[in-house]
Amino acid sequence: MFRAFHGQVIRISPTSHDYINPMDINLDYADDDDPLSLKSDFILSLCELVVGGKNGLEPVEKTVIDRCVRLVYQDFLSDPVPEKMPILEDLYNLLREQKEQEAQRLATALEIYVNGSLKVFNHRTNVELSNRMVCFDIKDLGKQLKKLGMLIVQDQVWNRETINRSA
């Protein structure tokens, strides 16, 4: 039925070839002049899901993530072309380069999502998201990826909303 109205269905699963990059950033992501702060907040939420635990991220971990988010977007922000959009692996590599022990813990927690069996979100976006009707099909993500998938889809919807508002 969705396709009958010319909607686009994006299937996201470990075996799908449709990819959404959680690191995608729209320069109009925020109403103010600092889209990077909102994106950093999103990445903090993503890392909190990945790291788990009842206490969430420690203050030092949050600081390290925020620092790495600002570093990972430098190339893209200086020349905003799709080829320079970072992916999770870029964040992972930056975390591994940091001297803090907490950074190594975060990188280790991200490893399964970068190099392991759950790497479905370690790709550049390869689907067109500009259709007026987009359905994100995440039913095949599985228990380990479902919450992460929901968070990433929510961020993509927000990206689209900000694009629509700035048009």
List each language-model region with its residue ranges.
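P-loop NTPase motor domains
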Residues: 3-5, 22-167
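Glycine-rich phosphate-binding loop of nucleotide-binding enzymes
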Residues: 1-14
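Interdomain hinge/linker at the junction between the two RecA-like core domains of SF2 helicases
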Residues: 14-22
